[in-house]
């Protein structure tokens, strides 16, 4: 699970849709696909090589026994049919990210389709997380309106985007760090690399780490300490 978490953090940095911070920074920065690739692909390639070395050199000792339940062919077909609307919506969203379609009509389309297909999904949305992001935008806007604070933060961040992104991610997680720091720098390539590499630090440094720990703790509550120990060592 720990290696999967590390792989998720490092692998997700390779594309604009790989993780929330990439999606946000790609949308606000105006970076082209080529500029984005030059910023993150070298690190992704190095990370892939290191993970392959670890996978093929470590002893094959499973952390815990996992039981996989086999699904019937009928159930598999039902699941596939149910995925079709979501795959279509995913395609539309990808076109928005690629700046082929405007986001406004796609947003309306997604909301209507979800309401028709599975309106219960609206009850499972993490509205607190969305509100947190909204508060970050408001906070950044307020800080930029205070000349002294704005100049101080710009002086702290500009020219140090990589290091600042890594350090800030350890404290407030990399998605909030990306949102916060983007208001005080124009070096989006350095910031992009910093918040992605910063996700490998503490448990709270990335949403992927928090999510994996949450699911692990729910399934194996007596093994939480072991997970934290292994995660910290890696």
At which residue positions do the language-model features occur?
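Generic alpha-helical transmembrane segments of integral inner-membrane proteins
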Residues: 45-53, 87, 91, 134
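Alpha-helical transmembrane segments and, especially, the helix-loop junctions at the ends
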Residues: 1-29, 52, 173-178, 191-217
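Alpha-helical transmembrane segments of multi-pass membrane proteins, especially transporters
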Residues: 1-4, 8, 36-44, 129, ...
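Transmembrane helical segments that form the transport core of multi-pass membrane transport proteins
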Residues: 88-186
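Juxtamembrane and boundary regions of transmembrane helices in multi-pass small-molecule transporters
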Residues: 34-78, 204-234
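Short, amphipathic, aromatic/basic-enriched membrane-interface segments that mark the entry/exit
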Residues: 69-81, 95-103
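Structural signature of hydrophobic alpha-helical transmembrane segments
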Residues: 9, 14, 40-48, 98-108, ...
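Membrane-interface helix termini and inter-helical loops of multi-pass transporters
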Residues: 22-37, 64-69, 146-156, 178
């Amino acid at each position: 699970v720990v290696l999967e978490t590390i792989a998720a953090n490092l692998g997700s940095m390779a594309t604009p849709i790989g993780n929330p911070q990439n999606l946000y920074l790609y949308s606000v920065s105006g970076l082209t696909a080529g500029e984005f690739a030059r910023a993150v692909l070298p690190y992704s390639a190095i990370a892939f090589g290191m993970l392959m070395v670890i996978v093929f050199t470590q002893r094959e000792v499973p952390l815990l026994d996992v039981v996989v339940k086999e699904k019937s062919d009928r159930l598999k077909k039902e699941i596939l049919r149910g995925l079709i609307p979501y795959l279509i919506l995913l395609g539309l969203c990808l076109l928005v990210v690629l700046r082929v379609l405007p986001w406004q009509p796609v947003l309306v389309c997604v909301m209507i389709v979800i309401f028709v297909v599975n309106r219960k999904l609206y009850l499972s949305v993490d509205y607190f997380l969305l509100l947190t992001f909204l508060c970050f935008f408001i906070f950044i806007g307020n800080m930029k309106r205070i000349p002294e604070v704005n100049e101080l933060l710009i002086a702290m961040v500009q020219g140090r985007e990589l290091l600042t992104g890594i350090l800030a991610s350890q404290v407030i997680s990399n998605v909030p760090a990306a949102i916060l720091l983007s208001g005080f720098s124009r070096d989006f390539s350095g910031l992009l690399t910093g918040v992605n590499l910063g996700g490998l630090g503490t448990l709270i440094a990335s949403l992927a780490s928090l999510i994996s720990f949450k699911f692990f703790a729910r399934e194996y509550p007596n093994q939480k300490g072991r997970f934290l120990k292994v995660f910290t060592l890696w």
